[in-house]
Amino acid sequence: MSTDAASLTKQMLLDPGFELTLRPMRYPQFYEMYRDAIRNSWTVEEINFQIDISDLHSKMTAADRHLIHRLVAFFATGDSIVSNNLVLNLYQHLNAPEARMYLSRQLYEEALHVQFYLTLLDNYLPDPTERFKAFAAVENIPSIRKKAEFCFKWIDSLQDLKRIETREQRRQFLLNQICFAACIEGLFFFAAFAYVYYFRSRGLLPGLASGTNWVFRDESCHMEFAFECVRTIRSEEPGLFDEAMQQQVYDMLEEAIECELAFAEDVLSGGVAGISMRDMRQYLQHCADQHFAKLGLPQRYHVRNPLPFMELQDVQELTNFFERRVSAYQVGVSGEVAFDHAF
């Protein structure tokens, strides 16, 4: 562990070690992200699912319910997979205490999301057998298993790596972080959010939509942190991001899109009015292009967002919620959130 200020300035984010020195702070942007995350606090207990339960029983078709059951099954384990990667791979290799502070907060938020989805399961699937099936979906439902296998492949890519020392190991780390930000949070979860907001556009499932607003905000911040890490590493070690690495990123997102489209084919198999496979493919390509831009790469698909209900989703509710938290707990945020800005 170094304590000399001059030597600290020479250290890079992926240098092996476990730096503990916060002053002088090398990456204040990570510390500010941590502080912003603290202000974005919310609790699952503030979500009311009563109207949702009524909607499920009286206002939804069999095709709608199939979509929801598949969505809940994906949510049952999705955030736990992200948490595992944070603990097993990211925390030990980002050698800046301010970055690890943010990861600690992100881990808390992922646990909060797990609690939200557990509460969702308890309300939407009161039958214990159905709940068990939802948690076993990563093994028993092919479209969800395909996404899980994609995730596990990238977790395994770093799991046995104790120190990042070579150029190839640094590339491995970057690809893992890009995968979990751009593919898992930025495609798998953002596609799931699109289904939620589709139901919201029909006036259905307000409890699910309210909780998703807050999860959406958290996940957007998680992605921005990961992209900032990638930009920082790229500026410190520009030689890592060569043409071969860029092609790996393109191929990775293309594979993730195909995994998510297999899930879309499953969840939309009953014929859900108002959303199609073509819509979902274009939406995923649109999201991927936004991620390429964040990574400093040329866009590949050049398509618009085909889902009008994803252009601006309930900004006033988000604003009012966080303003209430400022008054009551002094941990809220103010301002507007426009979901069409990046997604």
Describe these PLM feature segments.
Residues 2-24, 238-343:
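Extended, helix-rich structural scaffolds rather than catalytic motifs
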Residues 89-101, 123-131, 163-176, 194-214, ...:
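Inter-helical turn/loop segments and adjacent helix faces that build the functional surface
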